[in-house]
């Protein structure tokens, strides 16, 4: 990768603007998962240790652009950073006209999505952000697939634009999977809809040895094969696509195992009783909400045989304990494996957190859409502009 790293640049005394992905879940003003914050801390600390005056940008949630909403404020994130860094930390609401920050200080700016023009990569906004710094550091892998003012535009206009350590680690981990993976490769792709992961599924069948579909995606494959799935979530418009993927997989030598037994309920609720059933016994009023014990054993065996594992999405409704056994078993099997494993996506990260497996997965990606687009073989806009800018950067 032709990228200039933050560590290649002398940051001492410079105004360093870092775009991080600090989009964490917040409930009643409290951060409920600090995974992304923990991932970003080393980059911020490194810049401060280098004697830089550091300014951090991030989005949080999906506010109406240009409109302030307290529930989407980054103030709780600034409080968190204040407690976890041995440097002065200030929260700045109005920053587009300039930020007064000294070397060895951190200024956390309010949600970039409160600025009109952020999503459309408005040139005027991008230039205002670029004027805040001497060096722009793109470290937010989770937003690298978006050509927005704080990810792409600012990198165009900043005096110097470089890649942060977290972004580099993300790209290197994905590169290990995409460029030189050790076989056999097993991918677990769960979630509600085939439509949201259609490109990924097509890409993976030409790349992996085993592709395990889960959740609503698996239901669509089952329906396409003529199985009774009752009132389970599936996509009727994509049955032909599912059949095409199964044919393509056979041509490419990729195995797509489907559940032989499932866990069903009558309603989608936390109090709904769960019943194990073989696939042939699913009733017209059943809702498939997890994989059954026989399928769990089969999938765990496949995972244990892998040398490379890609995990994106749960195989059941793990938010409800009675339908969480499949996702939990898959997660533990990946954690116990000696294979190189990479996990990404919001629900996947939530499962890793829930089962306390953060230290046992080889690499946990902070990205959702960016993670998927990388696996699909797409070029990320924010990475592309950094590569372009790298051609004109003088390093130490």
UniProtKB/Swiss-Prot annotation:
Keywords (A to Z) from UniProt: ATP-binding, Cytoplasm, Glycolysis, Kinase, Nucleotide-binding, Transferase
Pfam families per the UniProt record, alphabetical: PGK
An individual GO BP term: glycolytic process
EC number(s) recorded for this UniProt protein: 2.7.2.3
Gene Ontology molecular-function annotations: ADP binding; ATP binding; phosphoglycerate kinase activity
Cellular compartment(s): Cytoplasm
GO cellular component terms attached to this protein's record: cytosol
Transferase as UniProt keyword: yes
EC top class, as a word: transferase
Residue positions binding ATP: 197, 319, 345-348
Major location (coarse): cytoplasm
InterPro entries: Phosphoglycerate_kinase, Phosphoglycerate_kinase_CS, Phosphoglycerate_kinase_N, Phosphoglycerate_kinase_sf
Protein residues bound to substrate: 21-23, 36, 59-62, 113, 146
Family the UniProt entry places it in: Belongs to the phosphoglycerate kinase family.
HAMAP family named in the record: Phosphoglyc_kinase
PANTHER family with a match to the protein in the record: PHOSPHOGLYCERATE KINASE (PTHR11406), PHOSPHOGLYCERATE KINASE 1, CHLOROPLASTIC-RELATED (PTHR11406:SF23)
UniProt name for this protein: Phosphoglycerate kinase
């Amino acid at each position: 990768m032709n990228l200039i790293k933050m560590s290649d640049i002398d940051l001492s005394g410079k105004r360093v603007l870092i775009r991080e992905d600090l989009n964490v879940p917040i409930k009643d003003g409290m951060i409920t998962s600090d995974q992304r914050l923990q991932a970003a801390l080393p980059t911020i600390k490194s810049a401060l240790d280098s004697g830089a005056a550091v300014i951090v940008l991030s989005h949080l949630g999906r506010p109406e652009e240009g409109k302030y909403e307290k529930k989407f404020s980054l103030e709780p994130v600034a409080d968190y950073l204040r407690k976890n860094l041995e440097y002065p930390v200030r929260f700045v609401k109005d920053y587009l006209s300039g930020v007064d920050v000294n070397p060895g200080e951190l200024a956390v700016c309010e949600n970039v999505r409160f600025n009109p023009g952020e999503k459309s990569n408005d040139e005027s906004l991008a230039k205002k952000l670029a004027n805040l710094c001497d060096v722009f550091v793109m470290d937010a892998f989770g937003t690298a697939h978006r050509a927005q003012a704080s990810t792409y535009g600012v990198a165009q206009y900043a005096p110097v634009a470089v890649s942060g350590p977290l972004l580099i680690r993300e790209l290197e981990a994905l590169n290990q999977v995409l460029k030189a993976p050790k076989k056999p490769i097993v991918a677990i792709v769960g979630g509600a809809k085939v439509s949201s992961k259609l490109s990924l599924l097509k890409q993976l069948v030409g790349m992996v040895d085993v592709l395990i579909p889960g959740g609503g995606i698996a239901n669509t494959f089952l329906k396409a094969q003529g199985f009774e799935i009752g009132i389970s979530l599936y996509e009727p418009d994509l049955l032909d696509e599912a059949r095409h993927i199964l044919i393509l997989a056979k041509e490419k030598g990729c195995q797509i195992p489907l559940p032989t037994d499932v866990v069903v309920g009558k309603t989608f609720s936390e109090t709904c009783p769960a019943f194990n059933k073989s696939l042939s016994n699913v009733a017209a009023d059943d809702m498939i909400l997890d994989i059954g014990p026989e399928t769990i054993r089969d999938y765990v065996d496949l995972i244990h045989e892998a040398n490379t594992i890609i995990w994106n999405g749960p195989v059941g409704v793990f938010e409800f304990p009675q339908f969480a056994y499949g996702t939990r078993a898959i997660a533990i099997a990946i954690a116990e494996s000696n294979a190189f494993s990479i996990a990404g996506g919001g629900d996947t990260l939530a499962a890793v957190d829930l089962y306390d497996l953060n230290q046992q997965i080889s690499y946990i990606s902070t990205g959702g859409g960016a993670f998927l687009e990388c696996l699909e073989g797409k070029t990320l806009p924010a990475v592309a502009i950094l590569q372009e800018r790298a051609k004109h950067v003088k390093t130490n």
